[in-house]
Amino acid sequence: MKRGMKMSDNLVHSSLDFLKDLEKFTLESKLLACQKYSSRIMTCSRVDMEKAYKENIMPWEIEALSAYSIIYNKSDVTEKLDSDTFANMITLIRNYWHEGLSDAEKKGMYPEIFIMISALQQFPVQGLILPKLFRYHYFFTFVNDKIDMKTIFIDKMGVDYERLEKFAFMVFMCFSKETQDEIPPHSLQVIITKVFADRDVLKLVTIEKEEYKNQLSELYGDNLIDQYYGLKVQYVYPFISDDDMMYIPSPYLIINAVTESMLNRITFQDNKLRRTIGKEVIESYLYDIISQLGTVTWISPEIEYKIAKNKKLTSDVIAAEGNCVAFYDAKAITPSLKVRKFDEEEIEKDIGIYAEDVIQIYHQIQNYLLGHFKLDKKYEKEKIYGIVVVLEDAVVSRKRVYVKAVELLRKEQGTVSEEIKNYIYSHIKVI
């Protein structure tokens, strides 16, 4: 890019009018094309982002195209979407320039806004599928004297979670290009038929075409721009039915459907349950995962202590490695959909939440240093760290989080020394 040139000067267009051309093609040809190219970037264990880059097609572009294929659809057309038109549509989707990016550029905030929006679109499908399935298996089968997630899950979903995770794993495997290259089509079809025989599970992750459009409309109205960056309905329902046909345009989204999306379904409009899951389940998971690290020399769940007559609790998990110790706090928050709409007020709200979490850990570290509670031994301040662990990251600017955290601390204490500021910046992280 030449010096002085705006980012938008390098992009093709700032209109979504081209999407109306999707009405010319049959729904079947559009969604099967999405499925074909989705499968090409799927290995048996993950969505291969390196391959996606080489193929010049990103998962979020396929997801956007499949969503708009349903929105822009006519039942009386017969023309099929060909490969060249598919490629052109993907390029147009990729090169769309949102006016929110122009506003961010004017404010000198383009890098952080672009990274945030891009990450929210791309991060959910990245990574190995087995660790993710393991994590949510732990969540949905967790039982202690405070919560029985097995029973809760069956009561809300009608099936046990093991059936869902097995179904998701098999779907992912069967639709990956690696599997399709190794197993003959007939044999693979036999396997898929057996997997789809679990009608109760299939129903949980399937949405009818018109209902899909209704849900998208409820989320974003008729605003095509918000739909462009917004969370797609197929993250919850990757299977789309139309009359006697069933489509899965992005097969890899079956993993998202039975993990983070399923947790959101279980806790929908039930903040009490989500708080309990955060307190009992996710804290326990964090403790169990950290305790299995071979480098950990000491670990403790949260410790109750008092300051004067007031009862306090430490961070969720405290773990040491030699002479270093880390305070971990788990946060089961979910990024607001408004963040994807470039809503500065909502972005600032999430920054404030993260900043409060940072200061909460800072106070715990200070309380330890002041002698309000003890660990297995004495640790020097420079060897004490804080980690805010978020289940779903809003990917807001960490720089703004730290600035806000220092601002909050200054309101509490009147002044914040450069030493304290530097300590917070260098020793407390959000991951």
Where are the regions a protein language model picked out?
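Residue-level signal for secondary-structure boundary elements
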Residues: 27-30, 101, 373
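Catalytic core segments in nucleotide and nucleic-acid processing enzymes
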Residues: 261-431
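Long, acidic, intrinsically disordered low-complexity segments
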Residues: 2-18, 213-228, 308-326, 331-336
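Interfaces and regulatory segments of ATP-dependent nucleotide/adenylate/phosphodiester-chemistry enzymes
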Residues: 34, 39-40, 46, 60-63, ...
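Non-catalytic C-terminal interaction segments of nucleic acid-processing enzymes
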Residues: 2-57, 380-382, 389-431
